[in-house]
Amino acid sequence: MTLEEIRDNAEDQERGRICHVVSPFDGTRTGISLRIVGPDSRTARNSRLQLEDELREAADKDGLVTAQGREDLVIQSLARLVLDVTADETAGQPFSLSHGNVVKLLRTSWIREQADAFAGDRRNFAPGSAR
């Protein structure tokens, strides 16, 4: 891979890729899809930096952040990587895209786990993988 290809891929990751959320019980699609930016995108970098700042601000005088506080901030950070959410008729109801609604969706641990795993797996963002 050339330096130019590496830069081009990082820019391409800004467009995101589709993560189809599947049931944790039988692996079938839920009808919910998330468009998530790649780990090398500018958006992901900015979200990581913002998370570090937020963790520092949330720390007590001993430099500690509660488990609940840390989880909330990590969910907020992951939500910043989601460009779009679609929900088809099998999902039951339409999804109104907003940061707050994405955060609510990601509070479901098995959805958050899938989104986080997808966002961190560079194979999903390989050159030529745009979907």
Residue ranges of model-derived segments:
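Extended acidic low-complexity intrinsically disordered regions
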Residues: M1-R15
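Generic marker of residues within folded, mature protein domains
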Residues: N9, P24-D26, D72
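Short, surface-exposed, charged amphipathic helix/loop patches that serve as local interaction elements
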Residues: T28-R131
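Short acidic-hydrophobic surface loop/beta-edge motif
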Residues: R15-G27
